[in-house]
UniProtKB/Swiss-Prot annotation:
PANTHER family: POL PROTEIN, RIBONUCLEASE H. This is Enzymatic polyprotein. The keyword Cell membrane does not apply. Encodes for at least two polypeptides: protease (PR) and reverse transcriptase (RT). The protease processes the polyprotein in cis. Reverse transcriptase is multifunctional enzyme that converts the viral RNA genome into dsDNA in viral cytoplasmic capsids. This enzyme displays a DNA polymerase activity that can copy either DNA or RNA templates, and a ribonuclease H (RNase H) activity that cleaves the RNA strand of RNA-DNA heteroduplexes in a partially processive 3'- to 5'-endonucleasic mode. GO terms for molecular function: aspartic-type endopeptidase activity; endonuclease activity; RNA-directed DNA polymerase activity.
Length: 680
């Protein structure tokens, strides 16, 4: 506890201004007692004090009781004192918020009320800024409290008597307890500026806060997803068979000597972690080792289990994963990010005893089953997402979670320090274990949802392009082609002409078309890959920016583009935010060209609805019919039923229509037939 010197009373120092030490934390607090007026105090926040301490002159005598166990406290001069009086369950009101303190001890320290470290821990995360501090109520509600630059002590002889209701006793003069004196008030600003060394102080406090963040992170990180010192084992799951009488068996696989050696190592590790155990289950699924590019990055093979048969036989979990576009809208406009990855997330979810036999697998070492949710079960992502949503839903204004990925986003560093602290505190509270090596703190650029998010732009991570370029020009079968087209679809927002680009390849996947890969197909693959040498960073539209969609249609395809108008120093700049394209269905190919243009608008709005609801936007098209179509009054002619439905659907949106000349519709260039034929 700090040792404070009392200064002269205010009446004796009329020409002296007193300022608190810049490293001291004084805040306003208020106490209420029956029969007394409100008692306003300048409280000292002392993280070095283990207890909350108050003067006997600020809490009425009838509220003090003898402590069950008197405590001995060592003070600054090295001597010890015994504290025997305590006040229990006191309410301290700070900026209108009630903070309940279980115990306050009585001791004369020269300060009315000392808020000790037990209070800071009870309402953590506690964060200090240059001009304020933050306590957190109920683990989720941050309370911002301004620091005092001048502090006084009111608790002297006669103070409580003067605070009784209807008392006519004059209140004693407050005693100034500020520790820095300024003899000339005119010099206050200059001396404060010099004394605080604001830039250095800010750096020092930032370092302190970063250190606190690192300490919080360390508390919740481990290489063991079931670390007994950190897990609370609160995540539980149950899996059930559709037909409980049926045993699900898949015959074992054959293994090479090298695979057997690798299994020896991995099974031992899993047993040591206590995530698996020997099994007598009637069910059986084969385990095998994967050695693809993603696993090479880990430096070794990884054991996986083929649960295809079990997944067909068990009841699914319909809990939805978050929509990725919705998550991206949450973080738009934010300036600073931190991201965290749950350590082997699914393994932090314990299976009940009845479910464990369903996870049984075979390998060279024998028959085992999981104590936790294993990777490969169809229910695993939904089970984990439900638990994570339950834990972090209260923080949705600055945190989003996609399965085992957690992202924290803020407008500035000060807010971010608080936000990160609250998330880490919640992880600590629930025993959610994070990976230290995958944590990214206080970044302007992060990877999330397979995207690089940087300064208001986004694009696919580099490995997406690497996968595309590493695909062979000659494909072996339909499965390999499906994987290639799947990667293209993943990056569809960044490829303006994807529908027509993939159509010749998509046609080879039809059920009635036998597999055949020709020289022309190889040339076409080379052409596709050549045209995908990089993805442009696209703009992430801010809520206040006006949005535009531009559309166009050809005989077989439609395309759309989302743009935003960014105003910078009075200049309007149109920035591309997303691309989408598609092919018309067989029946739609017979529509009139005007209807195809209308359908292109509708399809584009559907794709970008997350951004276009509920805002007023602009539709830009080179089709002269669409503007009049919106205003036409159809009277129920059955031949025009499609148009009536389209009008009704469009009426749910607020937009203007701008017609542009075909020569000015640069987006139409993206719908060229360049990819329809190899030799075009």
């Amino acid at each position: 506890m700090m040792n404070h010197l009392l200064l002269k009373t205010q009446t004796q120092t009329e020409q002296v201004m007193n300022v608190t030490n810049p490293n001291s934390i004084y805040i306003k607090g208020r106490l209420y007692f029956k029969g007394y007026k409100k008692i306003e105090l300048h409280c000292f926040v002392d993280t070095g004090a283990s207890l909350c301490i108050a003067s006997k002159f600020v809490i009425p005598e009838e509220h003090w009781v003898n402590a069950e166990r008197p405590i001995m406290v060592k003070i600054a001069d090295g001597s010890s004192i015994t504290i025997s009086k305590v006040c229990k369950d006191i309410d301290l009101i700070i900026v209108g918020v009630i903070f309940k303190i279980p115990t306050v001890y009585q001791q004369e320290s020269g300060i009315d009320f000392i808020i000790g470290n037990n209070f800071c821990q009870l309402y953590e995360p506690f964060i200090q800024f240059t001009d304020r501090v933050i306590f957190t109520k109920n683990k989720s509600y941050p309370v911002h409290i301004a620091k005092l630059t001048r502090a006084v002590r009111v608790g002297t002889e006669g103070f409580l008597e003067s605070m009784k209701k209807r008392s006519k006793t004059q209140q004693p003069e407050p005693v100034n307890i500020s520790t820095n004196k300024i003899e000339n008030p005119l010099e206050e600003i200059a001396i404060l500026s010099e004394g605080r060394r604001l830039s250095e102080e800010k750096l020092f406090i930032t370092q302190q806060r970063m250190q606190k963040t690192e300490e919080l992170l360390e508390k919740v990180c481990s290489e063991n997803p079931l670390d007994p010192n950190k897990t609370k084992q609160w995540m539980k799951a149950s899996i059930k068979l559709s037909d409980p009488s049926k045993a699900i068996k898949v015959k074992p696989m054959k293994y090479s000597p090298m695979d057997r050696e690798e299994f020896d190592k991995q099974i031992k590790e899993l047993l040591d972690l206590k995530v698996i155990k020997p099994s007598k289950s009637p069910h059986m699924a084969p385990a095998f080792l994967v050695n693809n590019e993603a696993e090479n990055g880990r430096g070794n093979k990884r054991m996986v289990v083929n649960y295809k048969a079990m997944n067909k036989a068990t009841v699914g979990d319909a809990y939805n994963l978050p929509n990725k576009d919705e998550l991206l809208t949450l973080i738009r406009g934010k300036k600073i990010f931190s991201s965290f990855d749950c350590k082997s997330g699914f393994w932090q979810v314990l299976l009940d005893q009845e479910s464990r036999p369903l996870t049984a697998f075979t390998c060279p070492q024998g028959h085992y089953e999981w104590n936790v949710v294993p990777f490969g079960l169809k229910q695993a992502p939904s089970i984990f997402q439900r638990h994570m949503d339950e834990a972090f839903r209260v923080f949705r204004k600055f945190c989003c979670v996609y399965v085992d990925d957690i992202v924290v986003f803020s407008n500035n560093e000060e807010d971010h320090l608080l936000h990160v602290a609250m998330i880490l505190q919640k992880c600590n509270q629930h025993g959610i274990i994070l990976s230290k090596k995958k944590a990214q703190l206080f970044k302007k650029k992060i990877n999330f949802l397979g995207l690089e998010i940087d300064e208001g732009t986004h694009k696919p991570q580099g490995h997406i392009l690497e996968h595309i370029n590493k695909f062979p020009d000659t494909l072996e079968d339909k499965k390999q082609l499906q994987r290639f087209l799947g990667i293209l679809t993943y990056a569809s927002d960044y490829i303006p002409n994807l529908a027509q680009m993939r159509q010749p390849l998509q046609a080879k996947l039809k059920e009635n078309v036998p597999w055949k890969w020709t020289k022309e197909d190889t040339l076409y693959m080379q052409k596709v890959k050549k045209n995908l040498q990089g993805f442009p960073p696209l703009h992430h539209p801010l809520p206040e920016e006006k949005l535009i969609i531009e559309t166009d249609a050809s005989d077989d395809y439609w395309g759309g583009m989302l743009k935003a108008i960014k105003i910078n120093e009075g200049t309007n700049t149109e920035l591309i935010c997303r691309y989408r394209s598609g092919s018309f269905k067989a029946a739609e190919r017979n529509y009139h060209s005007n209807d195809k243009e209308t359908l292109a608008v509708i399809n584009t709005i559907k794709k970008f609805s997350i951004y276009l609801t509920p805002v007023h936007f602009l539709i830009r098209t080179d089709n002269t019919h669409f503007k009049s179509f919106v205003n036409l009054n159809y009277k129920g002619d059955s031949k025009l039923g499609r148009n009536i439905r389209w009008q009704a659907w469009l009426s749910h949106y607020s937009f203007d229509v701008e017609h542009i000349k075909g020569t000015d519709n640069h987006f139409a260039d993206f719908l060229s037939r360049e990819f329809n034929k190899v030799n075009s």
